Each structure stands twice: as C-alpha cells, then as structure tokens.
C-alpha cells in the first residue's frame, strides 16, 4: 500500500501542560534543544522525567543537551487526523535517543514517505511550533 508523505500533526492542534518534573524538558524544547532527565547521583536517564530516580532514589536531576539524533525503535502508520478524523497521514514513532542510554521518546516522523519508515532508521530532531509558543520535538530521516 502507498500512503505518501508522512507529516507532523498540525501544531495549532497540540497543547501541552508542564509540571515541575517536565518543565525543564519543555523549556529546552522551546529553544530547539533536546534534553532528557539524568539522575545527578547515579547518571541513570529517564523519560518521562520523574521526581525520584527509579534506580537509586535520588532527587538530584541534570538536564544535558543531547545531539538530537536517534534510531526508530517502533512505529505505526496512521491515516486519519486524531482530532477531526480527516484524511491525514502521520507516523507516530518511538525513538531511542542518542546520548541518553535507555531513553526513548514518543514523537512523529515526517519529511519522507510513510512507507519508507522502518525500525532501525536513523532520525534527527525537527521542531514543530505548537500552541502558546512551545515547540514539539518530532523527527525526520537523518
């Protein structure tokens, strides 16, 4: 089956909320920088960020800037806009994030045909402007 170009979801339809654990991620994203929560005590990365490290119980956090690259771990091809049901090809992905061992990020991939997306595909972060001046990390083929 041929789906055609994979697109990012329309940014005007996406809104986020932050909390003390996620706000550093979203503030970095607003500046088009990819980061992940790293334990300041043991170095364990975790996404989504949590108040306490699941490995050692520490509350210390670091937010290193990551290279913005990764590898597709999993994906699905969708052909309907989830908000209004209109025809719209998009590809949600789970990406293993480079520079943060064990960290995976849910996003979308765009800039290629949906049928060309595959597990193991190298990707680079691409930013989608969304509501309230925030930016959403998505990916495109590297």
Specify the residue positions occupied by each region the protein language model found.
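Short, cysteine/histidine-rich loop/knuckle motifs that typically chelate Zn2+
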Residues: 38-41, 52-58
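A broadly conserved sequence feature marking short terminus-proximal activation segments
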Residues: 1-34, 100, 142
